[in-house]
Amino acid sequence: MKTLKITYILAATFALAGLSACNKFLDTTPDNRATVDSEEKVISLLGSAYSENDHILIAEFYSDNVDNYGIQYTGTSRFFDSIYEWSELEESNNESTERIWGSYYSAIASANQAIIAIDGLGGPETSTALSQALGEAYLCRAYSHFILVNMFCLQYNKQTSSTDLGIPYMTKPETTLAPHYERGNVADVYAQIEEDLVKGLALVGDDNYTVPKYHFNKLAAYAFAARFYLFYEKYDEVIKYADLCLGSSPSTMLRDYDVLATMPNGSPQQQPTTLHYVDPSVNANLLLFTAFSVMGQAFGAYSTASMYSHGAYLAKNEDCQANQPWGNSAYKDAPAVYNGSMDRVIFWRCPRIFQYTDPVAGIGFLRTVYPALSTDECLLNRAEAYVHLGDYNKACEDLNLWVHNCNTTKADMTP
């Protein structure tokens, strides 16, 4: 009987020891990378504060840059039909509105987590790296909300934006299941974007990355500010930040169209030309995004979406081959023209990159790289701001600088 009692005591002791060991095991984070407790982890986390699902394909199909060239071109799908017709999307893919919404809010969540983590590490005063990381986080949060409010709401205007429905502005990491958020209004969203933008501008730097153009840096922040304030109808601010971005010699900052003019534009050579266009060493590229995207295929020498295209009619009557205020001179970077199995007039801009998930089976995802912010856009934003302010001479100076950089014309525009 005594032996049996000792056996029970020993069994209970071992069981309690096991439970204690189990508790210790469960109290330990299985992957310490999940705890953002160092500068390096904060900086790594900010890599996910940029959306990997682009809005540019839908935006291009929604625009006047794409036309319906008829059923003789069979390259289409329900997705392309829907976005061209501005119809309700009934399916989801990497560039659907559902993915855009989710991906940009996911990027915002990462930015918010980085902001919380930096505060837990002592704040931006702790080190230059954390200070610049905080600036990047604020800018990422501002940029993602800016894209969302312009994709899903009416454009800002002083007359109606205080009553136009906005989007939820997320400033903290999510901590509850299925919470309810208020959309607010567009004016409120813009005010919050400006608040984050100003904070980010004061802190952002260029020192945390070996290739800073895949992250917000000083020049990219200035270019974003110029774009934002153009939409916000604060035109003096556009000029202020465009000046900071472009410097005293804007011509040295613009895209190298003389170099692009020497590169081949036929379909076999599409890839090197597009890769040069998004090269981080090019001065014009201020912020580069990578994305799961068919842009390089839908706007390339492929039959994808061939029913809807930028073709000969648009080129000759509306844009790159039509008469312009400076005449009908040619662009230095001549477009590729296809008029057989598809009707396309294309400038090589987005590379077609295939990411294999199974090289043996030959399956994976199409991806691309694109300039989210560039000096050429910044210059045109400044020109538009000058127009709004009635300074037509300065506007023409900027427009002439842009035209002579990309076009062979000798003519100047005057007020």
Where do the PLM segments sit?
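Sec-dependent bacterial lipoprotein signal peptides
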Residues: 1-22
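Membrane-proximal, proline-rich intrinsically disordered regions
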Residues: 22-68, 307, 312-313, 319
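Conserved, well-structured interaction surfaces
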Residues: 81-153, 184, 201-204, 363-370, ...
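Inward-facing hydrophobic residues that define packing positions of alpha-helical scaffold repeats
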Residues: 108-111, 190, 197, 242, ...
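Short coil/linker segments at helix-helix boundaries
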Residues: 152-192, 240
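Hydrophobic-face positions in mid-chain alpha helices that act as interaction patches
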Residues: 237-376, 408-415
